[in-house]
A protein has these predicted regions:
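Conserved active-site and cofactor/substrate-binding residues in soluble primary-metabolism enzymes
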Residues: 6-14, 42, 54, 58, ...
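Fold-independent oxyanion-binding glycine-rich loops
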Residues: 23, 50-53, 70-71, 102-105
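Structural motif
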Residues: 26, 44-48, 75, 96-100
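Glycine-rich phosphate/diphosphate-binding loops that line cofactor/substrate pockets in enzymes
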Residues: 34-42, 87-96
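Glycine-rich, flexible N-terminal cofactor/catalytic loop recognition
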Residues: 34-65, 72
């Protein structure tokens, strides 16, 4: 399969900026590689997931109305750090709590658990 990538070093940032540009209701927090809704409904449980990049549009492709409130993007085939996950939790907090959707990958399990 062929993919169009400007440079491997900027791939994740390019992808996240593109998703945010195509969907004005979303924003990209570049420092932590988090794609999130601009407006968070604080009267519902917020949903966050994430994982390694390279299988786009997962996970950022699931951010939107009726789906995730934020996605944390790791580097290509690498889990996001606990600092990235923690900042996603802080930026999407609600009065009803936050549910982290974690897949069964050891790096994701460890970093999402430590961030919580």
């Amino acid at each position: 399969m062929k993919k169009i990538i400007n440079t491997p070093e900027s791939f994740v940032y390019d992808m996240c900026h593109g998703i945010a540009a195509a969907h004005p209701e979303l924003e990209f927090v570049e420092q932590y590689k988090v794609v999130k809704k601009r407006e968070i409904n604080e009267d519902k449980v917020t949903l966050i997931s994430g994982g390694g990049s390279g299988h786009e549009p997962a996970h950022a492709g699931f951010v939107g109305k009726g789906m995730l409130d934020a996605a944390v993007c790791g580097d290509v085939f690498a889990s996001p750090s606990q600092v990235q996950v923690y900042n996603a939790i802080k930026r999407t907090k609600s009065n009803k709590g936050t549910l982290l959707i974690v897949k069964n990958y050891s790096g994701d399990c460890m970093n999402f658990n430590n961030a919580a």
